[in-house]
């Protein structure tokens, strides 16, 4: 038995459960949504769930939005490891064969998956900077962490991957685009949830500007 829930589409929903096969409970069931997928960074999941559960419990826009804004501020303080996407490179050996034929330096082939492309950039830069003895390359079966890069950058790349730790030797030339990361990981999730309940979701950075316009009647 559930008291309420949010339904996004078939097999994608969140329910507040009060009775589980005759046992009284107070829990949430997440099905098919990003917060239960392995691609969402683990460090972010408790915060995302807290906002979702507040949204369902209170049904109050201002209370929920306050937590959403706090999440935006928190996101900017987290380490790269805490916000990077994580995905398995199951067939990197096949992809790397293609890179040898179709990729030239930092130019990749059309349709290359972003996590594979990011792993390729990482491996390529390790070789380019003679760091293969210091850091492990990404191979088939490995998990790769990846993130969107600030533009412009020295290599003209949109994303970068790494295996365990992001090499400090790369940090002068490559920086994470935290605004874009927040948009892809957090904002996109709540944009769909807000829309499902008839709320308007605005990016926290844009809220202040909009509120000022309202205040000044511009």
Regions found by a protein language model. Give the residues of each.
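DNA-dependent DNA polymerase catalytic subunits
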Residues: 1-218
């Amino acid at each position: 038995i559930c008291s309420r829930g949010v339904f996004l589409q078939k097999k994608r929903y969140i329910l507040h459960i009060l009775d589980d096969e005759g046992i009284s409970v107070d829990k949430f069931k997440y099905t098919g949504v990003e917060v239960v997928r392995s691609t969402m960074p683990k460090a972010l999941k408790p915060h995302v769930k807290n906002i979702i559960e507040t949204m369902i419990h209170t049904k109050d826009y201002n209370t929920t939005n306050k937590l959403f804004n706090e999440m935006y501020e928190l996101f900017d303080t987290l380490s790269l490891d805490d916000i990077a996407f994580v995905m398995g490179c199951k067939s990197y050996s096949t992809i790397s064969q293609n890179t040898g034929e179709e990729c030239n330096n930092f130019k990749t082939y059309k349709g290359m998956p972003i996590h594979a492309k990011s792993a390729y950039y990482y491996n390529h830069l390790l070789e380019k900077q003679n760091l293969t003895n210091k850091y492990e390359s990404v191979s088939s079966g490995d998990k790769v962490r990846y993130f969107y890069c600030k533009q412009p950058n020295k290599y003209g790349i949109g994303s970068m991957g790494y295996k365990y730790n992001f090499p400090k030797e790369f940090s002068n030339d490559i920086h994470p685009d935290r605004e874009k990361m927040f948009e892809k990981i957090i904002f996109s999730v709540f944009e769909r949830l807000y829309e499902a309940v008839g709320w308007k979701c605005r990016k926290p950075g844009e809220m202040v500007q909009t509120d000022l316009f309202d205040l000044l009647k511009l």
